[in-house]
Amino acid sequence: PPKKGLYFGGDRPEPSKDRHVYKVLAFDAQSGSKLWEKDVHQGPPTTSIHLKNTYASETPVTDGSRVYAYFGNLGLFCLDMDGHELWTKRFEANPTRYGWGTAASPILHEGRLYIVNDNDKNSSLTALDASTGEEIWRINRDEPSNWATPYIWKHADRTELVTPGRNKVRSYDLNGKPLWQLGGMSSIVIPTPFAKHGLLYVTSGYVGDKIRPLFAIRPGASGDISLKEDETSNQFVAWYQA
């Protein structure tokens, strides 16, 4: 059974009152020597985190000219390759499930940054101009806290932005228009989808759940493609296992 403290927040029910320094560091890939270090924010956290989480769990992304570091409900920081700050986009801090914090990383595609920020309130999906940080579009999401990084799925029919979630796995076009949705995930959604062999694979799992679903999805889906009870496949779900 789940161990209290390890899975349910442990000794961190409230934000730390200590000053935290949020940093971006660059290292030489060949030697491992530090190239530069940039402090982007200092101050006590406004939200708590899970015992196994950090305030810097999100993975930075780069286009080779700029690096984008996202610190969940704190904000997004754009630096040049020498560590100079180019722009900053701050985000409102929202409550997460049991105060566990955030973890979903930004993704970069054709000059846009896509950020999913699923909390226990004010969940959203946002597209930003990568060069300026200006908001291109933003949609609200009917989702509780999730921790899965979105995935850009390119196939012969179109390019999709796939966002796993506890309520639904949802796919959007690059302008935020919903394409399809799929129910049946576990209570905690963390893994990033991926595509191979002409299919998209989406999964989630938690030690306290009875099912840990894995779906293989065909391209071209539309509408609600959720499986009915006792189904393991349909027109757009190639196969499923729990």
For each feature predicted by the language model, list its residue ranges.
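Noncatalytic, solvent-exposed loop/strand surfaces
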Residues: 1-242
